[in-house]
UniProtKB/Swiss-Prot annotation:
Its EC number is 4.2.3.73. Mg(2+) 1 binds at residues 301, 305. This is Terpene synthase 1. Its cofactor is Mg(2+); Mn(2+). It catalyses: (2E,6E)-farnesyl diphosphate = (+)-valencene + diphosphate.
Amino acid sequence: MSSGETFRPTADFHPSLWRNHFLKGASDFKTVDHTATQERHEALKEEVRRMITDAEDKPVQKLRLIDEVQRLGVAYHFEKEIEDAIQKLCPIYIDSNRADLHTVSLHFRLLRQQGIKISCDVFEKFKDDEGRFKSSLINDVQGMLSLYEAAYMAVRGEHILDEAIAFTTTHLKSLVAQDHVTPKLAEQINHALYRPLRKTLPRLEARYFMSMINSTSDHLYNKTLLNFAKLDFNILLELHKEELNELTKWWKDLDFTTKLPYARDRLVELYFWDLGTYFEPQYAFGRKIMTQLNYILSIIDDTYDAYGTLEELSLFTEAVQRWNIEAVDMLPEYMKLIYRTLLDAFNEIEEDMAKQGRSHCVRYAKEENQKVIGAYSVQAKWFSEGYVPTIEEYMPIALTSCAYTFVITNSFLGMGDFATKEVFEWISNNPKVVKAASVICRLMDDMQGHEFEQKRGHVASAIECYTKQHGVSKEEAIKMFEEEVANAWKDINEELMMKPTVVARPLLGTILNLARAIDFIYKEDDGYTHSYLIKDQIASVLGDHVPF
Protein backbone atom coordinates (compact mmCIF):
# COMPACT_ATOMS: atom_id res chain seq x y z
CA MET A 1 0.00 0.00 0.00
CA SER A 2 1.43 3.40 -0.95
CA SER A 3 1.88 6.10 1.69
CA GLY A 4 -1.01 8.08 0.23
CA GLU A 5 -3.54 5.28 0.45
CA THR A 6 -6.03 4.95 3.30
CA PHE A 7 -5.88 1.67 5.18
CA ARG A 8 -9.26 0.00 5.44
CA PRO A 9 -9.46 -3.41 7.21
CA THR A 10 -11.97 -4.91 4.77
CA ALA A 11 -13.17 -8.44 5.45
CA ASP A 12 -14.28 -9.82 2.07
CA PHE A 13 -17.65 -11.06 3.34
CA HIS A 14 -19.51 -13.40 1.03
CA PRO A 15 -22.49 -11.85 -0.83
CA SER A 16 -26.15 -12.38 -0.03
CA LEU A 17 -27.33 -15.94 -0.60
CA TRP A 18 -30.93 -14.80 -1.18
CA ARG A 19 -30.93 -11.45 -2.98
CA ASN A 20 -34.35 -11.20 -4.74
CA HIS A 21 -35.51 -14.69 -3.77
CA PHE A 22 -38.47 -13.41 -1.74
CA LEU A 23 -39.36 -10.57 -4.11
CA LYS A 24 -42.73 -11.13 -5.77
CA GLY A 25 -43.71 -10.02 -9.24
CA ALA A 26 -47.21 -9.15 -10.41
CA SER A 27 -47.78 -12.72 -11.60
CA ASP A 28 -47.16 -14.04 -8.07
CA PHE A 29 -50.22 -12.29 -6.68
CA LYS A 30 -53.16 -14.53 -7.41
CA THR A 31 -56.72 -14.16 -6.30
CA VAL A 32 -57.23 -17.05 -3.90
CA ASP A 33 -60.27 -17.74 -1.77
CA HIS A 34 -58.83 -18.36 1.69
CA THR A 35 -62.25 -18.83 3.27
CA ALA A 36 -62.16 -22.63 3.18
CA THR A 37 -58.67 -22.72 4.67
CA GLN A 38 -59.65 -20.36 7.47
CA GLU A 39 -62.81 -22.32 8.21
CA ARG A 40 -60.83 -25.57 8.47
CA HIS A 41 -58.26 -23.82 10.64
CA GLU A 42 -60.95 -22.58 13.04
CA ALA A 43 -62.63 -25.99 13.21
CA LEU A 44 -59.37 -27.78 14.00
CA LYS A 45 -58.43 -25.12 16.52
CA GLU A 46 -61.64 -25.67 18.45
CA GLU A 47 -61.05 -29.42 18.46
CA VAL A 48 -57.59 -28.91 19.93
CA ARG A 49 -59.00 -26.47 22.49
CA ARG A 50 -61.46 -29.13 23.63
CA MET A 51 -58.62 -31.66 23.96
CA ILE A 52 -56.72 -29.32 26.26
CA THR A 53 -59.72 -28.57 28.46
CA ASP A 54 -60.97 -32.17 28.55
CA ALA A 55 -59.40 -35.26 30.14
CA GLU A 56 -59.07 -33.72 33.62
CA ASP A 57 -58.85 -37.25 35.05
CA LYS A 58 -55.87 -38.16 32.81
CA PRO A 59 -53.01 -35.92 33.96
CA VAL A 60 -50.22 -37.86 32.21
CA GLN A 61 -52.09 -37.63 28.91
CA LYS A 62 -52.66 -33.91 29.57
CA LEU A 63 -48.95 -33.34 30.18
CA ARG A 64 -48.03 -34.98 26.90
CA LEU A 65 -50.69 -33.04 24.98
CA ILE A 66 -49.51 -29.67 26.34
CA ASP A 67 -45.90 -30.56 25.49
CA GLU A 68 -46.89 -31.43 21.91
CA VAL A 69 -48.97 -28.26 21.51
CA GLN A 70 -45.99 -26.18 22.60
CA ARG A 71 -43.42 -28.03 20.51
CA LEU A 72 -45.62 -27.83 17.42
CA GLY A 73 -45.72 -24.04 17.72
CA VAL A 74 -49.45 -23.54 18.25
CA ALA A 75 -49.53 -22.81 21.99
CA TYR A 76 -50.11 -19.10 21.25
CA HIS A 77 -53.71 -19.99 20.34
CA PHE A 78 -54.36 -21.57 23.74
CA GLU A 79 -52.46 -19.53 26.32
CA LYS A 80 -55.31 -19.31 28.84
CA GLU A 81 -56.27 -22.96 28.47
CA ILE A 82 -52.66 -24.08 28.96
CA GLU A 83 -52.19 -21.78 31.96
CA ASP A 84 -55.36 -23.17 33.58
CA ALA A 85 -54.33 -26.76 32.86
CA ILE A 86 -50.81 -26.24 34.24
CA GLN A 87 -52.16 -24.68 37.43
CA LYS A 88 -54.39 -27.71 37.97
CA LEU A 89 -51.46 -30.05 37.34
CA CYS A 90 -49.24 -28.33 39.93
CA PRO A 91 -49.95 -30.66 42.87
CA ILE A 92 -50.26 -33.89 40.87
CA TYR A 93 -47.67 -36.66 40.63
CA ILE A 94 -44.62 -34.77 41.82
CA ASP A 95 -44.85 -36.07 45.40
CA SER A 96 -45.98 -39.52 44.35
CA ASN A 97 -43.49 -42.35 44.65
CA ARG A 98 -45.32 -44.10 41.81
CA ALA A 99 -44.49 -41.46 39.19
CA ASP A 100 -41.80 -42.56 36.75
CA LEU A 101 -38.81 -40.50 35.60
CA HIS A 102 -40.44 -39.38 32.36
CA THR A 103 -43.60 -38.14 34.08
CA VAL A 104 -41.76 -36.32 36.87
CA SER A 105 -39.33 -34.73 34.40
CA LEU A 106 -42.01 -33.64 31.95
CA HIS A 107 -44.16 -32.25 34.76
CA PHE A 108 -41.17 -30.37 36.20
CA ARG A 109 -40.21 -28.87 32.83
CA LEU A 110 -43.71 -27.79 31.86
CA LEU A 111 -44.30 -26.08 35.21
CA ARG A 112 -40.98 -24.24 35.09
CA GLN A 113 -41.60 -23.21 31.48
CA GLN A 114 -44.84 -21.68 32.73
CA GLY A 115 -42.95 -19.67 35.36
CA ILE A 116 -43.68 -21.95 38.33
CA LYS A 117 -40.51 -22.59 40.34
CA ILE A 118 -41.16 -26.14 41.42
CA SER A 119 -38.39 -27.62 43.58
CA CYS A 120 -35.68 -29.73 41.95
CA ASP A 121 -35.81 -31.99 45.02
CA VAL A 122 -38.42 -34.02 43.13
CA PHE A 123 -35.49 -35.81 41.46
CA GLU A 124 -33.89 -36.97 44.72
CA LYS A 125 -35.91 -40.19 44.67
CA PHE A 126 -34.07 -41.21 41.50
CA LYS A 127 -30.73 -41.28 43.32
CA ASP A 128 -29.11 -44.22 45.08
CA ASP A 129 -27.70 -44.41 48.62
CA GLU A 130 -24.40 -42.93 47.44
CA GLY A 131 -26.07 -39.83 46.03
CA ARG A 132 -25.71 -40.77 42.36
CA PHE A 133 -28.48 -41.24 39.81
CA LYS A 134 -29.54 -44.88 39.81
CA SER A 135 -27.90 -47.05 37.15
CA SER A 136 -31.29 -48.64 36.45
CA LEU A 137 -32.40 -45.35 34.86
CA ILE A 138 -29.99 -45.86 31.96
CA ASN A 139 -32.35 -48.31 30.28
CA ASP A 140 -35.28 -45.86 30.49
CA VAL A 141 -34.44 -43.90 27.34
CA GLN A 142 -37.63 -41.83 27.33
CA GLY A 143 -37.12 -40.96 30.98
CA MET A 144 -33.47 -40.06 30.36
CA LEU A 145 -34.42 -37.75 27.49
CA SER A 146 -37.09 -36.08 29.61
CA LEU A 147 -34.67 -35.60 32.53
CA TYR A 148 -32.09 -34.14 30.16
CA GLU A 149 -34.59 -31.58 28.84
CA ALA A 150 -35.88 -30.75 32.33
CA ALA A 151 -32.38 -30.13 33.69
CA TYR A 152 -31.89 -27.16 31.36
CA MET A 153 -34.55 -25.31 33.37
CA ALA A 154 -32.01 -24.96 36.21
CA VAL A 155 -31.10 -21.83 38.13
CA ARG A 156 -27.79 -21.23 39.87
CA GLY A 157 -27.06 -23.55 42.79
CA GLU A 158 -29.26 -26.45 41.67
CA HIS A 159 -26.45 -29.00 41.60
CA ILE A 160 -28.75 -31.98 41.12
CA LEU A 161 -29.75 -30.57 37.73
CA ASP A 162 -26.11 -30.04 36.75
CA GLU A 163 -25.53 -33.68 37.69
CA ALA A 164 -28.59 -34.68 35.66
CA ILE A 165 -27.20 -33.03 32.52
CA ALA A 166 -23.85 -34.78 32.95
CA PHE A 167 -25.49 -38.15 33.71
CA THR A 168 -28.00 -38.11 30.86
CA THR A 169 -25.58 -36.68 28.30
CA THR A 170 -22.98 -39.36 29.01
CA HIS A 171 -25.37 -42.28 28.85
CA LEU A 172 -27.51 -41.05 25.95
CA LYS A 173 -24.36 -40.59 23.87
CA SER A 174 -23.27 -44.09 24.84
CA LEU A 175 -26.62 -45.60 23.85
CA VAL A 176 -26.35 -44.04 20.39
CA ALA A 177 -22.67 -44.93 19.94
CA GLN A 178 -23.29 -48.58 20.82
CA ASP A 179 -26.40 -48.89 18.61
CA HIS A 180 -28.58 -49.75 21.61
CA VAL A 181 -31.49 -47.71 20.25
CA THR A 182 -33.39 -47.66 16.97
CA PRO A 183 -32.20 -45.29 14.22
CA LYS A 184 -35.29 -43.12 14.75
CA LEU A 185 -34.70 -42.86 18.48
CA ALA A 186 -31.00 -42.22 17.89
CA GLU A 187 -31.94 -39.29 15.65
CA GLN A 188 -34.19 -37.85 18.38
CA ILE A 189 -31.43 -38.24 20.97
CA ASN A 190 -28.84 -36.56 18.75
CA HIS A 191 -31.27 -33.73 18.04
CA ALA A 192 -31.79 -33.13 21.76
CA LEU A 193 -28.09 -33.45 22.62
CA TYR A 194 -27.15 -30.90 19.99
CA ARG A 195 -29.62 -28.34 21.28
CA PRO A 196 -32.00 -28.84 24.23
CA LEU A 197 -35.54 -27.51 23.99
CA ARG A 198 -34.79 -24.60 26.30
CA LYS A 199 -32.33 -23.23 23.74
CA THR A 200 -34.30 -24.09 20.59
CA LEU A 201 -35.97 -21.50 18.36
CA PRO A 202 -39.73 -22.20 18.32
CA ARG A 203 -40.16 -22.18 14.51
CA LEU A 204 -37.29 -24.60 13.99
CA GLU A 205 -38.58 -26.93 16.70
CA ALA A 206 -42.09 -26.85 15.22
CA ARG A 207 -40.78 -27.77 11.78
CA TYR A 208 -38.58 -30.55 13.18
CA PHE A 209 -41.30 -31.96 15.43
CA MET A 210 -43.80 -32.15 12.58
CA SER A 211 -41.31 -34.07 10.46
CA MET A 212 -40.45 -36.35 13.36
CA ILE A 213 -44.10 -37.21 14.00
CA ASN A 214 -44.69 -37.75 10.27
CA SER A 215 -41.92 -40.33 10.11
CA THR A 216 -43.00 -42.32 13.15
CA SER A 217 -45.67 -44.98 13.45
CA ASP A 218 -46.42 -43.99 17.05
CA HIS A 219 -50.20 -44.10 17.24
CA LEU A 220 -50.14 -41.97 20.39
CA TYR A 221 -49.48 -38.78 18.45
CA ASN A 222 -52.71 -36.90 17.86
CA LYS A 223 -53.44 -36.49 14.15
CA THR A 224 -55.92 -33.68 14.69
CA LEU A 225 -53.32 -31.66 16.53
CA LEU A 226 -50.69 -32.44 13.89
CA ASN A 227 -52.98 -31.36 11.04
CA PHE A 228 -53.85 -28.15 12.86
CA ALA A 229 -50.17 -27.40 13.44
CA LYS A 230 -49.33 -27.97 9.77
CA LEU A 231 -52.17 -25.76 8.60
CA ASP A 232 -51.23 -23.03 11.08
CA PHE A 233 -47.57 -23.23 10.04
CA ASN A 234 -48.47 -22.88 6.36
CA ILE A 235 -50.79 -19.93 6.97
CA LEU A 236 -48.07 -18.16 8.93
CA LEU A 237 -45.53 -19.06 6.25
CA GLU A 238 -47.49 -17.05 3.69
CA LEU A 239 -47.59 -14.08 6.08
CA HIS A 240 -43.85 -14.32 6.75
CA LYS A 241 -43.04 -14.53 3.04
CA GLU A 242 -45.18 -11.47 2.35
CA GLU A 243 -43.32 -9.58 5.08
CA LEU A 244 -40.03 -10.60 3.47
CA ASN A 245 -41.34 -9.47 0.09
CA GLU A 246 -41.95 -5.97 1.47
CA LEU A 247 -38.61 -5.90 3.27
CA THR A 248 -36.82 -7.03 0.11
CA LYS A 249 -38.34 -4.07 -1.76
CA TRP A 250 -37.01 -1.76 0.95
CA TRP A 251 -33.59 -3.44 0.77
CA LYS A 252 -33.52 -3.20 -3.04
CA ASP A 253 -34.39 0.50 -2.96
CA LEU A 254 -31.52 1.18 -0.54
CA ASP A 255 -29.08 -0.64 -2.85
CA PHE A 256 -26.47 -0.93 -0.10
CA THR A 257 -25.10 -3.98 -1.90
CA THR A 258 -23.78 -1.72 -4.66
CA LYS A 259 -23.15 1.44 -2.67
CA LEU A 260 -21.58 -0.15 0.43
CA PRO A 261 -20.03 -3.38 -0.89
CA TYR A 262 -17.71 -3.80 2.12
CA ALA A 263 -20.61 -4.68 4.47
CA ARG A 264 -22.37 -7.96 5.16
CA ASP A 265 -25.59 -8.20 3.15
CA ARG A 266 -27.79 -10.27 5.45
CA LEU A 267 -31.40 -9.07 5.20
CA VAL A 268 -32.99 -12.54 5.12
CA GLU A 269 -30.77 -13.82 7.92
CA LEU A 270 -31.81 -10.86 10.07
CA TYR A 271 -35.47 -11.45 9.30
CA PHE A 272 -35.01 -15.10 10.31
CA TRP A 273 -33.35 -13.91 13.54
CA ASP A 274 -36.30 -11.63 14.23
CA LEU A 275 -38.77 -14.35 13.28
CA GLY A 276 -37.10 -16.40 15.99
CA THR A 277 -37.87 -13.58 18.40
CA TYR A 278 -41.60 -13.71 17.72
CA PHE A 279 -43.37 -15.46 14.86
CA GLU A 280 -47.00 -14.81 15.80
CA PRO A 281 -49.17 -12.75 13.40
CA GLN A 282 -49.79 -9.91 15.87
CA TYR A 283 -46.08 -9.05 15.81
CA ALA A 284 -45.77 -8.33 12.07
CA PHE A 285 -44.99 -4.66 12.75
CA GLY A 286 -42.35 -5.68 15.26
CA ARG A 287 -40.62 -7.98 12.78
CA LYS A 288 -40.56 -5.23 10.18
CA ILE A 289 -38.96 -2.59 12.38
CA MET A 290 -36.57 -5.05 14.01
CA THR A 291 -35.30 -6.21 10.63
CA GLN A 292 -34.89 -2.69 9.30
CA LEU A 293 -33.12 -1.30 12.37
CA ASN A 294 -30.92 -4.35 12.81
CA TYR A 295 -29.98 -4.32 9.12
CA ILE A 296 -28.92 -0.68 9.35
CA LEU A 297 -26.98 -1.37 12.55
CA SER A 298 -25.23 -4.31 10.88
CA ILE A 299 -24.08 -1.95 8.11
CA ILE A 300 -22.85 0.52 10.73
CA ASP A 301 -21.08 -2.27 12.62
CA ASP A 302 -19.17 -3.27 9.49
CA THR A 303 -18.39 0.37 8.77
CA TYR A 304 -16.65 0.62 12.15
CA ASP A 305 -15.05 -2.83 11.93
CA ALA A 306 -14.22 -3.21 8.28
CA TYR A 307 -14.03 0.09 6.43
CA GLY A 308 -14.09 3.47 8.15
CA THR A 309 -10.98 5.38 9.18
CA LEU A 310 -10.72 6.57 12.78
CA GLU A 311 -11.32 10.17 11.65
CA GLU A 312 -14.42 9.20 9.64
CA LEU A 313 -15.76 7.11 12.50
CA SER A 314 -15.29 9.96 14.95
CA LEU A 315 -17.40 12.17 12.69
CA PHE A 316 -20.12 9.54 12.39
CA THR A 317 -20.17 9.00 16.16
CA GLU A 318 -20.58 12.75 16.68
CA ALA A 319 -23.38 12.91 14.08
CA VAL A 320 -25.28 10.08 15.77
CA GLN A 321 -24.95 11.77 19.17
CA ARG A 322 -26.35 14.98 17.63
CA TRP A 323 -29.18 13.08 15.87
CA ASN A 324 -29.98 15.91 13.48
CA ILE A 325 -30.14 15.75 9.70
CA GLU A 326 -27.99 18.89 9.52
CA ALA A 327 -25.09 16.80 10.85
CA VAL A 328 -25.02 14.91 7.54
CA ASP A 329 -22.92 17.68 5.97
CA MET A 330 -19.95 16.81 8.18
CA LEU A 331 -19.79 13.23 6.88
CA PRO A 332 -17.98 11.66 3.90
CA GLU A 333 -20.28 10.71 1.02
CA TYR A 334 -20.65 7.01 1.79
CA MET A 335 -21.56 7.76 5.41
CA LYS A 336 -24.21 10.29 4.38
CA LEU A 337 -26.26 7.45 2.90
CA ILE A 338 -26.03 5.43 6.11
CA TYR A 339 -26.86 8.39 8.33
CA ARG A 340 -29.87 9.48 6.28
CA THR A 341 -31.17 5.89 6.20
CA LEU A 342 -30.81 5.61 9.98
CA LEU A 343 -32.71 8.83 10.66
CA ASP A 344 -35.34 8.08 8.02
CA ALA A 345 -36.01 4.64 9.51
CA PHE A 346 -36.52 6.07 12.99
CA ASN A 347 -38.72 8.88 11.65
CA GLU A 348 -40.94 6.36 9.88
CA ILE A 349 -41.17 4.19 13.00
CA GLU A 350 -42.04 7.26 15.06
CA GLU A 351 -44.87 8.10 12.66
CA ASP A 352 -46.20 4.53 12.81
CA MET A 353 -45.95 4.48 16.60
CA ALA A 354 -47.76 7.82 16.80
CA LYS A 355 -50.79 6.15 15.21
CA GLN A 356 -50.74 3.73 18.17
CA GLY A 357 -50.29 6.60 20.64
CA ARG A 358 -46.85 5.23 21.55
CA SER A 359 -44.37 7.49 19.74
CA HIS A 360 -42.77 8.40 23.10
CA CYS A 361 -41.28 4.89 23.24
CA VAL A 362 -39.05 5.44 20.21
CA ARG A 363 -36.61 7.67 22.09
CA TYR A 364 -35.48 4.66 24.13
CA ALA A 365 -34.41 2.86 20.95
CA LYS A 366 -32.62 6.00 19.74
CA GLU A 367 -30.73 6.27 23.02
CA GLU A 368 -29.70 2.61 22.90
CA ASN A 369 -28.55 3.10 19.30
CA GLN A 370 -26.39 6.01 20.43
CA LYS A 371 -24.89 3.90 23.22
CA VAL A 372 -24.01 1.10 20.79
CA ILE A 373 -22.32 3.46 18.35
CA GLY A 374 -20.47 5.10 21.23
CA ALA A 375 -19.14 1.65 22.17
CA TYR A 376 -18.19 0.98 18.53
CA SER A 377 -16.18 4.21 18.66
CA VAL A 378 -14.27 3.13 21.78
CA GLN A 379 -13.41 -0.21 20.20
CA ALA A 380 -12.33 1.46 16.96
CA LYS A 381 -9.91 3.58 18.98
CA TRP A 382 -8.59 0.49 20.80
CA PHE A 383 -7.97 -1.21 17.45
CA SER A 384 -6.29 1.85 15.97
CA GLU A 385 -3.90 2.01 18.95
CA GLY A 386 -3.32 -1.75 19.08
CA TYR A 387 -4.62 -1.66 22.65
CA VAL A 388 -5.73 -4.87 24.40
CA PRO A 389 -7.84 -3.94 27.45
CA THR A 390 -8.25 -6.01 30.59
CA ILE A 391 -11.33 -8.20 30.65
CA GLU A 392 -12.81 -5.88 33.30
CA GLU A 393 -12.35 -2.90 30.98
CA TYR A 394 -13.48 -4.81 27.91
CA MET A 395 -16.76 -6.34 29.07
CA PRO A 396 -18.82 -3.20 29.86
CA ILE A 397 -17.99 -1.75 26.43
CA ALA A 398 -18.41 -5.10 24.66
CA LEU A 399 -21.75 -5.83 26.31
CA THR A 400 -22.97 -2.52 24.87
CA SER A 401 -21.41 -3.05 21.44
CA CYS A 402 -23.00 -6.49 21.07
CA ALA A 403 -26.19 -4.38 20.80
CA TYR A 404 -28.53 -6.82 22.50
CA THR A 405 -30.05 -4.18 24.78
CA PHE A 406 -30.75 -2.19 21.61
CA VAL A 407 -32.22 -5.28 19.91
CA ILE A 408 -34.42 -6.07 22.92
CA THR A 409 -35.63 -2.46 23.00
CA ASN A 410 -36.48 -2.64 19.29
CA SER A 411 -38.37 -5.88 19.77
CA PHE A 412 -40.47 -4.32 22.53
CA LEU A 413 -41.47 -1.44 20.23
CA GLY A 414 -43.47 -3.99 18.25
CA MET A 415 -45.29 -5.52 21.23
CA GLY A 416 -48.07 -3.00 21.67
CA ASP A 417 -49.55 -2.34 25.10
CA PHE A 418 -47.29 -4.88 26.82
CA ALA A 419 -44.41 -2.42 26.42
CA THR A 420 -45.20 0.59 28.60
CA LYS A 421 -42.96 3.53 29.43
CA GLU A 422 -42.10 1.76 32.69
CA VAL A 423 -40.93 -1.29 30.72
CA PHE A 424 -38.54 0.80 28.63
CA GLU A 425 -37.21 2.46 31.79
CA TRP A 426 -36.67 -1.05 33.19
CA ILE A 427 -34.65 -2.09 30.12
CA SER A 428 -32.50 1.03 30.27
CA ASN A 429 -31.43 0.09 33.82
CA ASN A 430 -29.88 -3.16 32.50
CA PRO A 431 -31.84 -5.70 34.57
CA LYS A 432 -30.41 -9.17 35.18
CA VAL A 433 -32.32 -10.90 32.37
CA VAL A 434 -31.24 -8.30 29.78
CA LYS A 435 -27.63 -8.46 30.95
CA ALA A 436 -27.73 -12.28 30.80
CA ALA A 437 -28.91 -12.22 27.18
CA SER A 438 -26.14 -9.74 26.36
CA VAL A 439 -23.52 -11.94 28.05
CA ILE A 440 -24.67 -14.91 25.95
CA CYS A 441 -24.52 -12.78 22.81
CA ARG A 442 -21.11 -11.23 23.46
CA LEU A 443 -19.28 -14.32 24.68
CA MET A 444 -20.69 -16.73 22.08
CA ASP A 445 -19.92 -14.23 19.32
CA ASP A 446 -16.38 -13.79 20.63
CA MET A 447 -15.74 -17.51 21.09
CA GLN A 448 -16.85 -18.36 17.56
CA GLY A 449 -15.81 -15.28 15.61
CA HIS A 450 -12.50 -14.20 17.11
CA GLU A 451 -10.16 -16.22 14.85
CA PHE A 452 -11.74 -14.95 11.60
CA GLU A 453 -11.78 -11.40 12.96
CA GLN A 454 -8.18 -11.41 14.21
CA LYS A 455 -6.90 -12.70 10.86
CA ARG A 456 -8.37 -9.70 9.02
CA GLY A 457 -7.57 -7.15 11.70
CA HIS A 458 -10.09 -6.45 14.45
CA VAL A 459 -10.29 -5.11 17.98
CA ALA A 460 -9.32 -7.69 20.62
CA SER A 461 -12.14 -10.01 21.67
CA ALA A 462 -12.80 -11.39 25.16
CA ILE A 463 -10.49 -14.29 24.28
CA GLU A 464 -7.46 -12.08 23.56
CA CYS A 465 -8.18 -9.83 26.54
CA TYR A 466 -8.43 -12.71 29.00
CA THR A 467 -5.49 -14.76 27.72
CA LYS A 468 -3.17 -11.75 27.74
CA GLN A 469 -4.24 -10.55 31.16
CA HIS A 470 -4.11 -13.93 32.91
CA GLY A 471 -1.46 -15.74 30.89
CA VAL A 472 -3.71 -18.70 30.12
CA SER A 473 -4.39 -20.65 26.93
CA LYS A 474 -7.21 -19.92 24.53
CA GLU A 475 -8.80 -23.25 25.53
CA GLU A 476 -8.79 -22.27 29.21
CA ALA A 477 -10.38 -18.91 28.40
CA ILE A 478 -13.08 -20.55 26.30
CA LYS A 479 -13.86 -23.05 29.08
CA MET A 480 -14.35 -20.21 31.55
CA PHE A 481 -16.55 -18.26 29.14
CA GLU A 482 -18.65 -21.36 28.44
CA GLU A 483 -19.34 -21.55 32.17
CA GLU A 484 -20.34 -17.87 32.16
CA VAL A 485 -22.74 -18.53 29.29
CA ALA A 486 -24.24 -21.50 31.16
CA ASN A 487 -24.74 -19.30 34.23
CA ALA A 488 -26.34 -16.59 32.09
CA TRP A 489 -28.90 -19.16 30.91
CA LYS A 490 -29.61 -19.99 34.55
CA ASP A 491 -30.12 -16.29 35.27
CA ILE A 492 -32.65 -16.09 32.44
CA ASN A 493 -34.47 -19.12 33.86
CA GLU A 494 -34.55 -17.52 37.31
CA GLU A 495 -35.92 -14.22 36.04
CA LEU A 496 -38.67 -15.97 34.09
CA MET A 497 -39.77 -17.73 37.29
CA MET A 498 -39.89 -14.62 39.48
CA LYS A 499 -43.27 -14.06 41.10
CA PRO A 500 -44.63 -11.60 40.34
CA THR A 501 -42.72 -10.97 37.14
CA VAL A 502 -41.34 -7.45 36.83
CA VAL A 503 -42.73 -7.15 33.29
CA ALA A 504 -45.34 -9.11 31.34
CA ARG A 505 -44.38 -12.70 30.50
CA PRO A 506 -44.61 -12.17 26.70
CA LEU A 507 -41.83 -9.57 27.02
CA LEU A 508 -39.64 -11.95 29.00
CA GLY A 509 -40.38 -14.65 26.43
CA THR A 510 -39.05 -12.34 23.75
CA ILE A 511 -35.75 -11.98 25.63
CA LEU A 512 -35.58 -15.77 26.00
CA ASN A 513 -36.08 -16.19 22.25
CA LEU A 514 -33.36 -13.64 21.51
CA ALA A 515 -30.97 -15.69 23.66
CA ARG A 516 -32.06 -18.79 21.75
CA ALA A 517 -31.29 -17.01 18.48
CA ILE A 518 -27.73 -16.40 19.64
CA ASP A 519 -27.28 -20.06 20.53
CA PHE A 520 -28.49 -20.98 17.06
CA ILE A 521 -26.34 -18.46 15.19
CA TYR A 522 -23.12 -18.89 17.17
CA LYS A 523 -23.15 -22.44 18.56
CA GLU A 524 -20.35 -23.78 16.35
CA ASP A 525 -19.33 -20.84 14.17
CA ASP A 526 -20.39 -17.31 13.27
CA GLY A 527 -23.49 -18.27 11.29
CA TYR A 528 -24.39 -14.64 10.61
CA THR A 529 -21.11 -13.73 8.94
CA HIS A 530 -20.81 -17.15 7.27
CA SER A 531 -24.52 -17.45 6.59
CA TYR A 532 -24.26 -20.43 4.24
CA LEU A 533 -23.96 -22.43 7.49
CA ILE A 534 -27.59 -21.67 8.39
CA LYS A 535 -29.12 -21.54 4.91
CA ASP A 536 -30.85 -24.93 5.20
CA GLN A 537 -32.51 -24.04 8.49
CA ILE A 538 -33.74 -20.74 7.07
CA ALA A 539 -35.16 -22.59 4.07
CA SER A 540 -36.92 -25.06 6.37
CA VAL A 541 -39.09 -22.33 7.90
CA LEU A 542 -39.28 -19.88 4.97
CA GLY A 543 -39.39 -22.31 2.07
CA ASP A 544 -42.03 -24.81 1.01
CA HIS A 545 -45.31 -25.57 2.75
CA VAL A 546 -45.37 -28.43 5.22
CA PRO A 547 -46.99 -31.36 3.38
CA PHE A 548 -50.06 -33.06 4.81
